[in-house]
Amino acid sequence: MGACCSCLGNRGGDGSHTQLLLAENEREAISALLQYLENRSDVDFFSNGPLRALSTLVYSENIDLQRSAALAFAEITEKDVREVNRDVLEPILILLQSADSEVQRAACGALGNLAVNTENKILIVEMGGLEPLIRQMMSTNIEVQCNAVGCITNLATQDDNKSKIAKSGALIPLTKLAKSKDIRVQRNATGALLNMTHSGENRQELVNAGAVPVLVSLLSNEDADVQYYCTTALSNIAVDEVNRKKLASTEPKLVGQLVHLMDSPSPRVQCQATLALRNLASDSGYQVEIVRAGGLPHLVQLLTCNHQPLVLAAVACIRNISIHPLNEALIIEAGFLKPLVGLLDYTDSEEIQCHAVSTLRNLAASSEKNRTALLAAGAVDKCKELVLKVPLTVQSEISACFAILALADDLKPKLYESHIIDVLIPLTFSENGEVCGNSAAALANLCSRVSNEHKQYILNNWAQPNEGIYGFLIRFLESGSPTFEHIALWTILQLLESNNTEINALIKENETILAGIKNLSASQQQIQQSQIGQTTTTTTTNITNNNTNTNTNTNTTTSTSNEDQFEDPKVELFNLTQQILQILG
């Protein structure tokens, strides 16, 4: 225990005089404590005699005894961290009220040590520990500041404490101390601010306390820990749309600083800077700004690094950036396609695969040149190779990508040649609505405007695999789902309108298909009788499924249902059946 109990012995001179002035109970406590210290390895200082002896010193009016008690608590708790009760915490909280900086420093240290334990964190706050800790944070003594902020940092890791800390008045002094010249205080303060960013309400309190400009200014700090805490805190703050708008209007240097940190020698700083950019890129303005700030060369390098969390952060970021049409060509020119295709082999990370496919889908959405580049990079072949054996989430993304690609007439010949129909048909058996619907939409679009040059691909897949296009049409006609019925009817109509004798014969001569069409027509006819006239309407609507999405913090996938495209599915179904029957004669 050494120095922490220096006043317990007979120091001679003033010390001897002090000892003569001690009360009887204090002398007894000192004597008992010295004996306990001699056998410290066998003593539980948090109960019975040892705790009573320490408490006696705490309540003494003698400052030397208070210091000894505080130092003893600090050293004991450093070596023995476990759940304690109110009887242990109460004397430490009393010491926290002292005006003596040495007592304050040691008491804050002891409380911070005990605040490593979850139960202790809750009890310290319940017993009113925040108020004296906030006072000590504002001390002029650096050591007291450091220990007080460190304790708050530990307390803020407990979810139940966070809102209490946010409302306690602690955020303003924490923000001020984040600018301290002492690196220990800076680390503790920025760490505490980070711990306060895990809920929307607390993030708003933090923004209101003026923490954002301080966090942004500290991104250029030379200390990797401070950089990490600040980038992570800003990343969490950027989860909220209202905060992103505020950042856009008040922090013009933020994106440039984060882009610079993607080159940090610290992988965790790199990762958090990239995640912060990913969250900012939930907004279209930031999607463009990140590219203008030179973010693409950094991101494309990170996609091929060996640190999986960093790869995940980078591919999630580029997924959001790729949503903006102005960025599509720039991303392809920056060399992203091959790394993105390579990430599809990341079989131990569904998230990486999903983000990679979604990015490829975004890039293919609007440009023939981009789609051609996508094909040349091997994206379609790789997706086709993997789609039947990847997890459902990845399968959903790939099927959505297929649906987008199949919309493009310029790409259809290449898709036929890749034998993509061989995987689309099995995917239409999926019990997952998105996978089934996306795959059916892709298959339907491949069946539209079939040229004589490519009719053989339809004929070859008419009955295979898995009963082929024929089986797909029957299943969807009999599905009972208006969406799936519509896809089947639309596909049949497109095949007939291709005016290919062989394909038309396959439909006209198939009694099951004809029966399915007539049954749907009959079931809708009575309902729709009053809504249709003497002539039928025509439709050139493609079957689409666009599920480009922005994701923030957590990885989510959104998709648009085909059913939402039609104001009245029943009218649409009836009209389709009438058009088909008219062609069939």
UniProtKB/Swiss-Prot annotation:
Keyword Transmembrane among record annotations: no
Keyword line: Lipoprotein, Membrane, Myristate, Palmitate, Repeat, Vacuole
Keyword check for Membrane: yes
Lipid attachment in record (S-palmitoyl cysteine): C4, C5, C7
Domain of life: Eukaryota
Major place of residence: membrane
A GO BP entry: establishment of organelle localization
Localisation per UniProt entry: Vacuole membrane
Renumbered ranges of ARM repeats: 39-76, 77-116, 118-157, 159-198, 200-239, 243-282, 284-323, 325-365, 409-448
Transmembrane segments: none
Pfam families assigned to the protein according to its UniProt record, in alphabetical order: Arm
Membrane-protein topology: Lipid-anchor
GO molecular function: identical protein binding; protein-membrane adaptor activity
Lipid attachment points (N-myristoyl glycine): G2
Record-linked InterPro entries: ARM-like, ARM-type_fold, Armadillo, Vac8
GO cellular component: a single term: nucleus-vacuole junction
Biased composition (Low complexity): 531-562
Region named Disordered: 531-565
Protein function: Functions in both vacuole inheritance and protein targeting from the cytoplasm to vacuole. Vacuole inheritance has a role in the regulation of hyphal cell division.
UniProt record similarity statement: Belongs to the beta-catenin family.
PANTHER family to which the protein is assigned, alphabetical: VACUOLAR PROTEIN 8
Listed name of the protein: Vacuolar protein 8
Organism: Candida albicans (strain SC5314 / ATCC MYA-2876) (Yeast)
Taxonomic path: Eukaryota, Fungi, Dikarya, Ascomycota, Saccharomycotina
